[in-house]
Amino acid sequence: MSRPQQAFPPIRDQRGEPHVRRFDEQRWLIDNIIRANGIDWDQPRSLYIHAPCGIEANADFAGIRERVKKMADIGPAFAAVARRREAKANAAALADHKVTARDNFFMAAVHWGAAQWPYDENDETNISYNNKKRECYAKYAALADHHVEAVWVPFKGKAIPAWLHLPPNYTSGKVPVVIAVPGMDSYKEIQVALYGDKFLNRGMAVLAIDGPGDRKSVV
């Protein structure tokens, strides 16, 4: 039995493949959707990015949700909050307020990572946000209430970037390890909570990676 013809057959390119347009060429569509539905138009991104930070970040994300009216607003909105958190962290570090510094370096790293999301090329902005994210997270790691270190996992002649978290009060010996693999819209810096992480609190280590082709793996 023959298949029914499509009412609207795809437009094909010179190779005979369906002609598609790049995301940027259709930006007006997503801008209209964001204007109507907000930053969480397709998934609850502001919620899962917020969650690892805890309640202190409530105002950060409330302000970001209010400011984002189009795709081009996302990066600058998160970057502005990241700068504010980083400045607060640096001031706290100078005053030897280690917990305040630690918490704010963590939140700054989270916001820098979120600011990267709209950029699909390794341009100057994306790379600078990535560097700030890694710098802030390294400063958080130095002050964390458990051991955190940067590691690189060998992969097909290259290496996958990761953060290794050991459970609180770890001294020596083997422990179970959870490998946290974020999706394309996520990143390794939000895979372990600032407080009360469900894996670390159960005595497990966490290896949080950026998968091949994503975030630092690309940069």
Predicted regions and their residues:
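Long, non-catalytic architectural segments outside compact domain cores
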Residues: S2-I74
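N-terminal cap/lid segment of alpha/beta-hydrolase-fold proteins
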Residues: P76-F78, A82, I127-T171
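Hydrophobic/aromatic side-chain positions at a characteristic register within alpha-helices
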Residues: E86, N90-A93, T100
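A structural signal for well-ordered alpha-helices, especially hydrophobic packing surfaces
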Residues: E86, W112-Y119, Y137, A141
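Flexible helix-coil transition and linker loops at the boundaries of alpha-helical arrays
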Residues: L94-K98, Y140-L143
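Short, charge-rich amphipathic alpha-helical segments embedded
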Residues: K98, R102-S128
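Cap/lid segment of the alpha/beta-hydrolase catalytic domain
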Residues: T171-V219
